[in-house]
Regions:
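Conserved catalytic core of the tyrosine transesterase superfamily
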Residues: 1-304
């Protein structure tokens, strides 16, 4: 079976991250059912039962990997497979979005005020300008951290203040930039111009956000999501915000919340956030304040 699994994974036109997840799922499948197990409904059910202690999201990834493998091998009775999937699937309950808005806004305010001293070293000045531009980009565009770190300078249409990106699910989308995020990016890139003459990479192909640590020296090297999150957490400490109070995805939550509060239009927020389903955006509806106002009218104002 392992030979077939390797053949299956080699044919997949998916991201490296997805292939890694599928490989892990299929290795777990082999460990559970055995390398010589027949690819039938009974084997599939045995695997589903073994997943009961895992989270709904993990179960979904594992099921998808195994079902695609069955399809690749042209194995299994598909009506029975569908019925077994429905019977043994643990449904995940809907969760509303909850984040510490006050802490996020404190981090945003601190990063927006970053203005390095002229006497600071070049790397420190560039790091401060980069971190300011990065945080403002996250909160004003709704980009995921991986999407922001993947941006190239040539991706930005500076006149229209937008970029066309390849986002989640390998889908192309238009992302709009605010005036302040564009200004912060331009200030950062202008300061970085003293480094770029040493680069052999064409300007349009250079990363929008780069490393400026000692190991990077004066070369233009892209910064990873992990490296950028580490930098933001350091800014959180400087802003006296507990690192556990803000998660990296909270900046995206903040973006969606602000768009909904400003317009009260879930469909518009869905489009700007690039959510595939309106049900995802609907998790932010409790921020609208209508229920709060009604509750206050019923239980508080009558007591005054």
């Amino acid at each position: 079976m392992e030979t077939e699994i390797n053949r299956f994974l080699e044919t997949l036109d998916r991201s490296a991250k997805t292939i890694f997840a599928y490989r892990h799922a299929l290795l777990q499948f082999v460990r559970t059912v055995g390398n010589n197990a027949p690819l039938n409904t009974e084997t599939y059910v045995k695997f589903l039962i073994s997943l009961r202690q895992k989270s709904p999201s993990t179960q979904r990834v594992y099921r998808t990997a195994v079902r695609k493998f069955y399809a690749f091998c042209k194995a299994g009775n598909w009506p029975e497979i569908e019925e077994a999937t429905d019977h043994y699937t643990r449904k995940a309950g809907k969760r509303i979005v909850n984040f510490n808005r006050e802490a996020v806004e404190k981090v945003i305010s601190y990063c927006e005020s970053l203005n390095p001293e002229p006497s600071a070293s070049l790397s420190k000045r560039l790091e401060a300008l980069r971190d300011r531009a990065f945080v403002l980009t996250l909160v004003d565009t709704g980009l995921r951290i991986s999407e922001a770190c993947s941006l190239k300078r040539g991706d930005i249409d500076w006149l229209e203040q937008r970029a066309i990106i390849i986002g989640k699910g390998d889908k192309q989308a238009v992302v709009r930039f605010s005036n302040r995020s564009i200004q912060a990016l331009q200030a950062y890139l202008h300061a970085r111009s003293v480094v770029e003459p040493n680069s052999r990479i064409p300007l349009s192909s250079q990363p929008l956000f780069a490393r400026h640590d000692i190991r990077a020296s004066k070369k233009i090297r892209p910064i990873t999501s992990g490296g950028m999150w580490k930098a933001i957490k350091a800014r959180m400490t400087e802003a006296n915000v507990d690192r556990h109070m803000v998660r990296i995805h909270d900046f995206r939550h903040y973006f969606v919340t602000m768009t909904y509060l400003a317009k009260g239009n879930l469909k518009l927020s869905q489009e700007l956030a690039r959510h595939e389903s309106i049900s995802t955006t609907n998790r932010y509806a409790h921020f609208g304040g209508e229920a709060d106002a009604a509750y206050d009218e019923i239980f508080n104002k009558r007591q005054k």
